[in-house]
């Protein structure tokens, strides 16, 4: 809150260990920054993560939120490693999802009229970011998000070659594409490119997004490492379990496996 409101920054990085409460922290930040009445865009890389976040924010919000889900239908989209499906289908979401711009425009207007004093939260995958941009244009210039929360923000780094179209993950940085007053980038694993790589990118007119670029990501205003989270009893320390086997037991297992293979061969012969 101090970073965004009192210092007036429009971008910032929140670095917290996995499981230490990034989602809950972002909810409280959004509520505090907008007095619980803002327009929030929450971006995630998969439908499964969208589902988790939707349920978490709905359950933990101080006041009831008005959620809208935007993501592609996995039944009609091609299955690629870059798709937004994860392990959950659109049909399993707690709220109906759509990528239809007109439906989104209508939903936003309905939600705002029904709950004018509540927080409107658009949950979306990065892959559907162009749909959000088109919906913003359809609604009008007055519809600007108060805050964009970029979860798994290390996914928004990368290289764009000259003449190529930016990926959906990278386009979130552009305020001319998606209009917002503030941007929160949160991750447990910030991705940084070496100085020499950044210099080479400049020489070759390559657009490089690295999380140490404060123009894109803002300053790091809070960090909670795994070790610190354990000290604060937010996480349990991990234990290393090493399994050992002596040679006697190893030989016994090998003999049993050989006997099983022999029995299988005899069975095959008998079946013939």
PLM regions: where:
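Conserved helicase motor
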Residues: 69-79, 93-102, 125-131, 155-156
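Walker A/P-loop
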Residues: 8-29
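Pre-Walker A (Motif I) flank of P-loop NTPase domains
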Residues: 7-13, 38, 120
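Conserved Walker A/P-loop ATP-binding site and its immediately adjacent core
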Residues: 34-62, 66-81, 126-128
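SF2 helicase catalytic motif II
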Residues: 127-128, 138-185, 189-191
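Conserved helix/coil segment N-terminal to the catalytic DExD/H
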Residues: 104-144
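Pre-Walker A adenine-sensing motif
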Residues: 1-6
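Interdomain helical connector at the RecA1-RecA2 junction of SF1/SF2 helicase-like NTPases
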Residues: 195-272
């Amino acid at each position: 809150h101090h970073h965004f409101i009192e210092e007036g920054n429009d971008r910032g990085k929140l670095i917290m260990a996995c499981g230490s409460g990034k989602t809950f922290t972002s909810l409280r930040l959004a509520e505090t920054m907008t007095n619980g009445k803002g327009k929030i865009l929450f971006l995630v890389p998969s439908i499964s993560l969208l589902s988790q976040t939707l349920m978490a924010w709905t359950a933990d919000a101080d006041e009831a939120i008005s959620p809208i889900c935007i993501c592609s239908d996995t039944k009609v989209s091609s299955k690629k490693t870059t798709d937004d499906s994860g392990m959950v289908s659109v049909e399993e979401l707690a709220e109906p999802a759509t990528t239809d711009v007109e439906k989104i425009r209508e939903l936003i207007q309905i939600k705002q009229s029904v709950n004018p004093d509540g927080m409107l939260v658009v949950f979306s995958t990065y892959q559907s970011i162009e749909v959000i941009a088109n919906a913003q244009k359809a609604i009008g210039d007055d519809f600007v998000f108060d805050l964009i929360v970029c979860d798994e923000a290390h996914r928004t780094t990368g290289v764009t070659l000259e003449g190529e179209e930016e990926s959906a993950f990278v386009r979130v940085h552009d305020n001319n594409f998606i209009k917002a007053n503030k941007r929160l980038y949160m991750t447990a694993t910030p991705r940084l490119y070496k100085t020499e790589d950044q210099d080479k990118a400049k020489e070759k007119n390559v657009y490089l997004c690295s999380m140490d670029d404060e123009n894109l990501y803002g300053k790091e205003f809070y960090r909670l490492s795994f070790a610190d989270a354990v000290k604060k009893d937010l996480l349990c320390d991990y234990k290393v379990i090493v399994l050992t086997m002596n040679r006697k037991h190893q030989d016994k297992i090998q003999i049993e496996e050989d006997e099983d293979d022999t029995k299988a061969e005899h069975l095959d012969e008998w079946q013939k």
